[in-house]
């Protein structure tokens, strides 16, 4: 991410950028930062966008070969094309001879690092992963936004807020906006405010169900199950998520019995 910001700051751009990973909010932010730095907002003549797995490579190449109209650059944005998991040999070949005026921006959720397109972008530009952020990073980010609005919150209430919203930054941003509007005119955000306006995510209800089951709180577990059904969550998915979490708990218990350290447990269970 810092490399993209440095390119924008120095105005020394690469010819290809790949933004990939699970954190859609950050990908969206950096996609727009790049686009706005490369072209004026109203320059629609030199900006083109392709989306989806039906994107036709010959059309992309034809457009790429078109000189920019009264501008220094032509920018082509390609989103969720699947080119980085499936074969896209014609485009991978073309990556070796991009016109000087061209900048390609690819946005994908999943990539195969053995893929020719991934290697081509690495050679010609930058491949940047936008992974889910850890709790410490999210907490710092949210506190920064609260501070700008003159708001204060205790650490415990901040943890409750993140537990309620989950780790998706897009959802956190939306819930925070609701919270800031609700507490307008007050300096301190409380747990009562969070409970009043913030929506609990489905995955968090799953964790609450697990806690209720392990604590033998049958009524609470059933209430949470009904909440999930009301949210149109399929019963088989609920069962799958519960089974997966209990399986993880069992693995952790067994590894602790073997006196494994936290790093080993994280590696073996895939919780890194």
For the regions a protein language model found, what residue spans apply to each?
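Conserved beta/loop motifs at nucleotide-recognition and modification sites
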Residues: 1-272
